Amino acid sequence: MVRYNPNEIEPRWQAYWDEHHTFATPEKVGKKKRYVLDMFPYPSGDGLHVGHPEGYTATDIVSRFARARGESVLHPMGFDAFGLPAEEHAIKTGEHPRVQTQRNIDNFTRQLKMLGFSYDWDRVLATTDEEYFRWTQWIFGVLYDTWFDHDQQKGRPISELPIPAEVTAEGELEIEQYRDSKRLAYLDDALVNWCPKLGTVLANEEVVDGKSEVGGHPVKRIPLRQWMLRITDYAERLLDGLDDLDWPTGIKKLQSDWIGRSTGGEVDFYLQRGAAGDDTGPFVAFKRARESEGFPTDPGKDCLRVYTTRPDTLFGATYMVVAPEHPLIDVLVKPEQKDEVDAYREKASFKSDRERTDGDRAKTGVFTGSYAINPADGRSIPIWVADYVLAGYGTGAIMAVPAHDERDFEFAVAFDLPVIPVVDPPADHKQREEILAGKACFAAEGVAINSGEYDGKTTAEVKAALTAELAKQGLACEAVNYKLRDWLFSRQRFWGEPFPVLHEIDSEGNATGVRRLVPDDQLPVTLPELADFKPHGRPEPPLAKADDDWLIVELDGKRYRRETNTMPQWAGSCWYYLRYIDPKNSDALIDPQKEKDWMPVDLYVGGAEHAVLHLLYSRFWHKVLFDRGHVTCPEPFGKLVNQGMILGEVEFTSFVDPSGKHVSTKDVKKDAEGNRVHKATGEQVEIVSLTEEQVVKKGEGFVLASDASIKVDSRAFKMSKSRGNVVNPDSVVRDYGADSLRLYEMFMGPLEATKPWAMNGVGGVRSFLDRVWRMIIDEPEDELKVSDAVVDTACDEEQLRVLHQTIRKVTEDNEAMSFNTAIAKMMEFTNHFTRCETRPREAMESFLILLAPYAPHMCEELWKHLGHNESISLQPWPKWDEAALVQSSIEIPVQINGKVKAKISLSPDAKPNEMGEAALADPAVQNAIGDKKVVKTIAVPGRMVNLVVK
């Protein structure tokens, strides 16, 4: 007996596709193109788990579907291969990161090919390939050579930057320093998350509870000279560009919130030189100077500048707060406060931004000993340092209005600071009396109180009037602010792209302050060979240990020292979609005509965890390349789809009391210490795991199979090695086949939904494929033979209708990426035709073309056995005939007094009176009525006829 054997079939067809380059991208793009892209994976040592293929299968279906419809398809794959895990492995084992990375890439490639994805493997790339990161370095050079013209709202060559006359008069070095201050890529002292153990700077997202996400090592905030990218110059365009993108609304909102545009005002608070109330005279002089000179770009050291979205609440500012890293800290802190402030700042340096801004944290802070003057009313207010204010947002200082800001209110309560309400809430507000008494916070808009001449005006009116008045005095100006910060772009690690930057040094080896790019013809700058990759434990990159042969460069008669930081992992993933289009071009980033033919990406699929940073950074780089004329479209990704997470299998747990008796989940609570106890007895209960055989479904939940009164807990968790619920696709493919895995992941539910893995579900899909096999292949034979039921005959009317309904449904569902419902329709088709004594070949062949994007290996095999030599992947997509969808007649039941007595055939368009007449004319109905009288006829078009007789 010859059965469906995927372990024999699948490797054979994978080899066929490789040998024949079945999925090679066409050199000449046709009338319609489809660029389908997966977010490429980091090649970890663990390989793929079953969550990875979900998105890959979806894009593979789209790609195969598009090819069948005659579209030119680009569907590539590659690897985001730089990264800290490989370097950590190298430090532990001494094995070069390149060796482990290539081993992991080979394993990923094996697994991806094992799953039958129709990638163009001739275009595969890795960000660690020297020929690839040569162009990553080249793009950095473009960023370095670009400044942002705010008038034109675009990036321009640095050579076109207007140089002020006073700078020109200072000389060439000053001119170069002025250019450096405007470049999109620049050096700056930045507060960074420094991890001594890892020996590198970490992004905020890589720090969890003050420790590194990788390894759990302590992280400290320190100032460090870093490469930065001026992404903030593009904030407005990054925000505006979201409007035209076919992206999930939630993802757009995440990006919008990350950019965080707000409007308000910048306000300067004059710093008192003495104790509170001592600076009336100097303050008056300061105000006179400001009235004549206006609001300066740089506030200097006489003021604390704040940004506020609520200038209307200035009269309610009762204290100020500066971030622990504020540049004026040393000016503000009085000698008697220094030790306390220093200790506080040191403690704050070990906290991440997330920790510091956690709303549930108790507020902490220290008084600096200094005061500032509120420009609205001339009051002296104290200046505190507190870690809930971040140096990177706004100006790093705030005016604290505890009556109308929740964080400020909590701080004021903690340190017994005054609360002055200046906005009257609506009369029907539940807490109005407490708010007006300074006992509660009100953050919304209202009517001004305790605000001098502005009393009685609305929030909007006070904002406009007070900002205008202070602007006239040179103490404020309207401002737009963004939460988005410039991108910290350098890392103190080995396994990353070297910067193509040279620092000039004098004869003593000291830096002169002059920098230049490595010439294009000397790219790529490759990594040096190092004896070890261990970090120093101090902020000095591993590349600084390189031999002088690599480190020191002579160029045009001058000596230079290479930049020893490396780029972050984000760098290579910012532009890989472009290189896929022209991966072997050694003369240019991309051929202009090919870029024009293929861009933008038509469909981009990946996890929502990349919603903010990767997508934002890619869009930023792309816009710079667009401004500089290297690409022709302003956005890289037209349509974005986020696949949902596949969780581990559902886990069942129950509780048992000390006697071992099961306790229902509804009868358990947590006590004050967090222990789970029986609600009635107070006895502590223990969690026990249950097998699937020990539970049964009841309503929306599960209960014990042995006692239906005991409700059990059922939930699925994210797959992780620590939980032991990771499912390896290798074992699934071995036991069920790749087609079963692909089909199951698409059948689990909507692509975007989060859903739990269930191995019995894979078995169910495998059973469906077995039925498809038996529908075409005669299994009882000793040799593989097409079933005698498959014949060269035309479909009957019903078969034709089922076929064309299936073609239409699968086509429309493929277009909508509703793959689960397409599969359900193909299951209906199979159920119908397996009941047919004859199965027309045209129906079987059309069905296989529909199923092929989902289960390509099996369909190739069946297609071959139906007598075809050419791959099913090259066959045109079937089209449905609207006429075939229409039934010429339908069969409906005829009831007499509610009981079915006969069935009649009639037109689906028959009207109620025609249905009644046809029913009465049927002999079986006449016989059932006998001598009784029909007193009422009820006809439901297309459904049934009911005759009421007496």
From Swiss-Prot:
Source species taxonomy: Bacteria, Pseudomonadati, Planctomycetota, Planctomycetia, Pirellulales
Keyword tags: Aminoacyl-tRNA synthetase, ATP-binding, Cytoplasm, Ligase, Nucleotide-binding, Protein biosynthesis
Molecular function per GO: aminoacyl-tRNA deacylase activity; ATP binding; leucine-tRNA ligase activity
Record gene name: leuS
Catalytic activity: tRNA(Leu) + L-leucine + ATP = L-leucyl-tRNA(Leu) + AMP + diphosphate
Coiled-coil region list: none
TM helices/strands, residue ranges: none
Entry's localization field: Cytoplasm
Motif 'HIGH' region location, chain numbering: 41-52
Main location: cytoplasm
Motif 'KMSKS' region per UniProt: ranges: 718-722
Top-level taxon in the UniProt lineage: Bacteria
Pfam families, sorted: Anticodon_1, tRNA-synt_1, tRNA-synt_1_2
PROSITE patterns found in the cross-reference section: AA_TRNA_LIGASE_I
GO BP: leucyl-tRNA aminoacylation
Listed EC numbers: 6.1.1.4
NCBIfam families hit by this protein: leuS_bact
Tagged with keyword Phosphoprotein: no
Protein name: Leucine--tRNA ligase
The keyword Membrane is annotated on this UniProt entry: no
Residue sites binding ATP per the record: 721
Similarity annotation: Belongs to the class-I aminoacyl-tRNA synthetase family.
GO cellular component terms attached to this protein's record: cytosol
